[in-house]
């Protein structure tokens, strides 16, 4: 239920899970989406596509980032979350950690993991296959859905309440991530390439920086 375990010790967690034949079911909405897209698939994938809202400063020019406040960083445009993860979302540190998490959960090299800005947070993630087909998992930004999926898998819970309305979301947009504006994303990818304790060091540095 936390990504840091896989960020700092993914190699050991996944090795132990394999030895004990213990499946790991993701709860993060992005990784739950990928998992759901992979259920029943036997063919290798071309890439994983992880989406992100862009956080509180998505529409803010780079030159104005030096003047932002903590209060501004805590205003996430889509999700209601704790303070630490909301700050990490504003810097895309959280998304970088999710790339590391996806690498360990699905055995996908960093070169085959793409991050796209998706302001509406409706498409939670996608999987592209070698034949060009892309599967996506869509839904409102509500953590109850990935949590219930993990708890009930392989069945699905019956959830009362309002259903997703496509007419209320007529436009879904996507864009590439500005790596200069969000350097933490590339740092996380580089940690994966370096292996060893690099990701653990990044996590520790971020814990101190955000505290």
Label the model's feature ranges:
Residues 1-211:
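Catalytic, metal-anchored helix/loop core of enzyme active sites in primary metabolism
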